[in-house]
Amino acid sequence: MKITIHRGASQVGGCVTEIESDGYKVFIDFGEQLPGAEKKEPLKIDGLNYGDVSKSALLISHYHGDHIGKICETNANLRIYMGKTALEIYKCLEQRLSFIPKKEESEKHKEIVERIEKINTFKALQQIKVGKIAVTPLFVDHSAFDAYMFVIEANGKRILHTGDFRGHGFRSKGLLPSLKSYAKNIDYIISEGTNIQRPNATIQTEQELQKDFERSFGKNKYNFVLVSSTNVDRIFSLYHASKKAKRCFICDSYQAKILKIVSENHKQYSSFYNIDYANKTTPAGRFFVLNPNRENFYSFDGELKPYLEKYGFCMLIRSNSRFQPLLDEYAQSDATRVYYSIWSG
């Protein structure tokens, strides 16, 4: 067995790892470098983006661009695997991005949409065989939903590739039991190290953040939250915080589609992912989907505006000019708060 870290050992993002055994190859992640990072020479990797790929497979740990962003550079015949819900979310995101005005960027995302049509999906503990290499995905908690670690077995050796994971999320309590059950007798660990050089970083748990939002929503009537559309657990926690603070919950149709993907796939496992779309009797967590008006901006029209101003709301926003008129309008009120809920690094 041979392990090669092609990229990711000396930087955050742009990850790609290779495990080779008897001519068969498993690659884990093939990502873009993070914006602002020093650009390195493009990678040319036999069995991944050139040469014979009949004995290769690429496994994607999660849908963040620094782990999946280079898939269009792979050989078209390469087998690619990804979590089922993660793939649905990623497809929704890329379809959305394929409509951005800049033609070059739009074409890039259209190419990704076409490429991911051929991706195979897996579920936790569903073993994948590549020659004599066996890979077992383990579900982990991360800001990207449906993320995985991998246990790789070949030539009598066992490797744990952690992917990105966290210990402060809603589903983190399953990490240690999962490792104790399925990651025994590990010979080598390939681990992410995002916070290794941030020893003084303060990390709140997602549960603590939800409580903070709940308290603030209760004190303030008009709440706008700038949040990544694919930070799924954070968004569901905002929904529950709104419900407990007796505020309405508002998002656009694209965000609603992502929430529906997760809810349909996972609400049977946890009520955390269950949204009461049918609620029309109480403002607590009442779900509204906003569509842009004729001028392509978001606004509260008709009977919606007095209802929201009576009971208050939490609205999800993104760095998009469509949301600006609403922000400008409600900026005049002392009851308005805007929250920046995005990783800054």
Where in the sequence are the language-model features?
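His/Asp/Glu-rich metal-coordinating catalytic cores
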Residues: K2-L59, D66-D233, S237-H240, C248, ...
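Short, charged/polar "capping" segments at the starts of alpha-helices
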Residues: G36, E88-K91, A256-I261, G345
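Short secondary-structure boundary segments
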Residues: K84, S253, I342
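Polar/charged alpha-helical tracts
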Residues: Q95, E111-E114, E264, K305-K310, ...
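Hard-cation-handling environments
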Residues: R198-P325
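Conserved mixed alpha/beta catalytic, RNA-binding, or beta-rich assembly cores of soluble enzyme
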Residues: C314-F323, D328-G345
